UniProtKB/Swiss-Prot annotation:
Family: Belongs to the AdoMet synthase family.
Chief site of localization: cytoplasm
UniProt cofactor note: Binds 2 divalent ions per subunit. Binds 1 potassium ion per subunit.
Provenance organism: Actinobacillus succinogenes (strain ATCC 55618 / DSM 22257 / CCUG 43843 / 130Z)
Organism phylogeny: Bacteria, Pseudomonadati, Pseudomonadota, Gammaproteobacteria, Pasteurellales
Protein name: S-adenosylmethionine synthase
Alphabetized GO MF terms: ATP binding; magnesium ion binding; methionine adenosyltransferase activity
Keywords per UniProt: ATP-binding, Cytoplasm, Magnesium, Metal-binding, Nucleotide-binding, One-carbon metabolism, Potassium, Transferase
Length: 383
């Protein structure tokens, strides 16, 4: 019997890097509402008293960047100066330019199906049957802890909570099956007036216990709640935030490889984002079809070229058919050209702000989480 530990972390919507991601994706959504053909690469930087929104955007749309940025910050919960960051009064700086024509001529084509990739790059997709959402358990439950923190903060259950928080879970595996949770780490910003005893009890009773299945917790599970003992200064006052700096939190929590490209603020012509979504869609349908217990797929693209330059698939010894057959089925059932995958997943819609906190994968509301190809794949594989 082989045993191992595996750990993943998540961060809250009030974490500085996630504030930046949400602003960038809010800008993208507002532009896509008006101009489906827009080219958007929006980056945000937040620090005490300011938000800087920059990047390259080519569009016919008009967006009130300042007002939108303030709205996102306030929606997250930073709307009082006593939190160290206030969406009503912070400075909002705009440093947006246009996308290079050199890039544009390589992407746009007369025939949409010939649309080239917006950049070179490698993207990975992954799925596993260890949870009902075909995601690794450590990242799934780390996200759920952060969603719960936001819920009890916003509904007043724990009104001393503040927006900035982080979670980390260490799972125990035997022969690659979950047998329990070894360690729970949860750090949350809080009001200065609350005692550490109240923080520990509130977090345990209102966040940890409602989220983590009791069957995975035992007397040996270790809990680290605000282990530094105090977390009053948080958000952009504690750390600066930047778009695209939580790429492992956004994906599989380290359980699968990552091509390095961030998602937020990028329109679907950027394969960093759209092809990573398509790769997840492919991997999830393969696992849902029963063709493997775990599946990782790598795609690669060249700038200005429509067809992927490579497709690689790995099932870690869990495949029910040969990997070569799976690659053949992927090519047959999924159009992985940039325009093809945009159409396949209906990506030119204002759906991206919601992706920018609590993970891009394992959340059923997104189109790349559908398992509508599973039955066809299973039949084609002869299972």
């Amino acid at each position: 019997m082989s045993t191992h530990l595996f750990t993943s972390e998540s961060v809250s919507e009030g974490h500085p890097d996630k504030i930046a991601d949400q602003i960038s994706d809010a800008v993208l959504d507002e532009i896509l509402k008006q101009d489906p053909k827009a080219r958007v690469a929006c980056e945000t930087y937040v620090k005490t008293g300011m938000a800087l929104v920059g990047g390259e955007i080519t569009t016919s749309a008009w967006v009130d960047i300042e007002n939108l940025t303030r709205q996102v910050i306030c929606d997250i919960g930073y709307k009082h100066s006593d939190m160290g960051f206030d969406g009503h009064s912070c400075a909002v700086l705009n440093a947006i330019g246009k996308q290079s024509q050199d890039i544009n001529q390589g992407v746009d084509r007369e025939n949409p199906l010939d649309q080239g990739a917006g950049d070179q790059g490698i993207m990975f997709g992954y799925a596993t049957n260890e949870t009902e959402v075909f995601m690794p358990a450590p990242i799934t439950y780390a996200h759920r802890l952060m969603e719960r923190q936001a819920k009890v903060r916003k509904d007043g259950t724990l009104d001393w909570l503040r927006p900035d928080a982080k979670s980390q879970l260490t799972f125990k595996y035997e022969d690659n099956k979950i047998v329990g949770i070894d360690a729970v780490v949860l750090s949350t910003q809080h009001a200065e007036s609350v005692s550490q005893k109240e923080v520990h009890e509130g977090v345990m009773e209102e966040i940890i216990k409602p989220v983590l299945p009791a069957k995975w917790l035992d007397k040996d599970t270790k809990y680290f709640i605000n282990p530094t003992g105090r977390f009053v200064i948080g958000g952009p006052m504690g750390d600066c935030g930047l778009t695209g700096r939580k790429i492992i939190v956004d994906t599989y929590g380290g359980a699968a490889r990552h091509g390095g490209g961030a998602f937020s603020g990028k329109d679907p012509s950027k394969v960093d984002r759209s092809a990573a979504y398509a790769a997840r869609y492919v991997a999830k349908n393969i696992v849902a079809a029963g063709l493997a217990d775990r599946c990782e797929i790598q795609l690669s693209y060249a700038i200005g070229v429509a067809e992927p330059t490579s497709i690689m698939l790995e099932t870690f010894g869990t495949g029910k058919v040969a990997n070569e057959l799976l690659v053949k089925l992927v090519r047959e059932f999924f159009d992985l050209r940039p325009y093809g995958l945009i159409q396949m997943l209906d990506l030119i819609r204002p759906i991206y702000r919601e992706t920018a906190a609590y993970g891009h994968f394992g959340r059923e509301q997104f189109p790349w989480e559908k398992i509508d190809r599973a039955a066809e794949l299973s039949a084609a594989a002869g299972l």
